[in-house]
Amino acid sequence: MSGIYIHIPFCKQACHYCDFHFSTSMKKKEEMVLALAKEIRLRKSESDGENVETIYFGGGTPSVLTSGEIDFLIAEVYENYSVVENPEITLEANPDDLSSERILELSKSKVNRLSIGIQSFFEDDLQMMNRAHNSAEAQKCLKEATKYFDNISIDLIYGV
């Protein structure tokens, strides 16, 4: 099994528990997307002809990308690698990025799995972690996502 992980090192804000490298400035986002596309092309020779079964957008917060940027990067993978007929394509997302309109938009793309960073349904925990969403928003986005996606995971932090 072969998969491609695409790291998106941007976030709207810093969560207090996060140790990952990221930037809250979006000034270089377009430049980074183009650099990722170049990296996808440059790494083509390392694939040994294996079929790509999964494409995973992780981060940071990949849901800060526009649908056009996501589609562009997926197209780069398809153009440069042998991709199975129905690959699992995951986008990590925060609830505050998943409006009803955005979920519908993503459902029309090749993304077929959402990994939603809810972290907690408790308001005190969310505030302490400096999350941008509240519990009601998390529940609403999860309910909305289930209308359009059959494959959803959520991140929860235990014992905060």
Regions found by a protein language model. Give the residues of each.
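Conserved non-cysteine loop/helix-boundary elements of the Radical SAM core domain that shape
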Residues: 22-46, 50-160
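Local cysteine-cluster metal-coordination motifs and their immediate loop/turn environment
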Residues: 9-20
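Extreme N-terminal starter segment of soluble prokaryotic enzymes
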Residues: 1-4
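Alpha/beta-hydrolase
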Residues: 6-8, 118
